[in-house]
Regions:
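Thiamine diphosphate
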Residues: 1-60, 65-88, 174-249
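Cofactor-binding loop segments of dinucleotide-utilizing enzymes, especially the Rossmann-like FAD-
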Residues: 13, 39, 99, 203, ...
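Hydrophobic alpha-helical scaffolding
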Residues: 46, 69, 73, 142, ...
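Short helix/loop capping segments that flank catalytic or ligand/cofactor-binding pockets
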Residues: 20, 46, 105-107, 209-211
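Glycine-rich beta-alpha junction loops
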Residues: 41-42, 98-105, 204-206
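Conformationally flexible catalytic loops at phosphate/diphosphate-handling active centers
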Residues: 94-189
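Structural beta-sheet core signal
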Residues: 10, 36, 96, 200-201, ...
Length: 249
């Protein structure tokens, strides 16, 4: 459907995601703006479990997909929009991940985004360009060719150039969602003491529990903080370093 110019999304996790990996390499490598929403769960190994775990999406780190992480139902609502908007503008495949059951089945009141607020944020020129590149007998193209190592290497290096624009694109749309919602999303959100000497780095629902721990420890004389990862892939070292207080040891 993506090759035909249709905006395509799916929802999956665990073993279902494992079955998609071969196709993900093709979609990620061809920069098709698919979006997958992943309620991350255990992948069966020596035992079976249906509960939350990062095994499934961690297995997909080399597929060429960007990975956006949510820690709560509200974040899942807001960052889902960021994933879709960024996929179109950057011309990049996205996974939007949140913890299975802990977040995906949590009963919580949220503020739903209005589609009319999101409509002006869509990059229509990028959308038209994506549809123009779709398979069409009126303007045939050749894709998925067999190439020698020299060309393969150049294509891989070209993918790095494409990935380099993703962090700024994601932050741009986070800023737009911040304007609509009044919330404060960044690629890496910092929480805790401004002069923290110890900082823990987490992503997804663990950050909600860590925030309570940070509050408790700071109230008892410790200087601690939390860096919450939202954009895990492509990982921006520059933005990550900027989120950590200079006092951190």
């Amino acid at each position: 459907s993506l090759q035909a110019g249709a905006l395509t999304t799916t929802f999956t996790s665990s073993q279902g995601l494992m079955l998609m990996i071969p196709a993900m390499y093709a979609m990620g490598g061809q920069f098709l703006p698919s979006v997958m929403h992943i309620a991350s769960r255990v992948v069966t190994s020596n035992h079976h479990s249906i509960f939350g775990d990062h095994t499934d999406f961690m297995t997909c780190r080399t597929t060429g997909y960007a990975m956006l992480m949510s820690s709560s139902p509200q974040e899942a609502m807001d960052l889902a929009a960021v994933a879709h908007l960024s996929a179109i503008k950057a011309g990049y495949a996205f996974m939007h991940c949140f913890d299975g059951f802990r977040t995906s089945h949590e009963m919580q009141r949220i503020e739903a985004l209005d589609y009319e607020d999101l409509r002006p944020l869509m990059d229509t020129e990028a959308l038209d360009a994506f549809r123009h590149k779709s398979l069409n007998p009126e303007h045939p193209t050749n894709r998925g060719n067999n190439v020698n190592p020299d060309i393969y290497f150049q294509c891989k290096e070209g993918a790095n150039v494409k990935a380099a624009v993703v962090p700024e694109t994601v932050q741009h749309y986070m800023d737009e969602i911040n304007k609509i919602t009044g919330r404060d999303y960044k690629l890496f959100n910092y929480y805790g003491a401004e002069d923290a000497e110890e900082v823990i780095v987490v992503m997804c629902s663990a950050s909600e529990a860590v925030k309570e721990t940070v509050d408790f420890l700071n109230a008892n004389g410790r200087k601690v903080g939390l860096v919450q990862i939202h954009l895990y892939r492509p990982f921006s070292v520059e933005h990550f370093a900027a989120a950590i207080p200079a006092s951190c040891k």
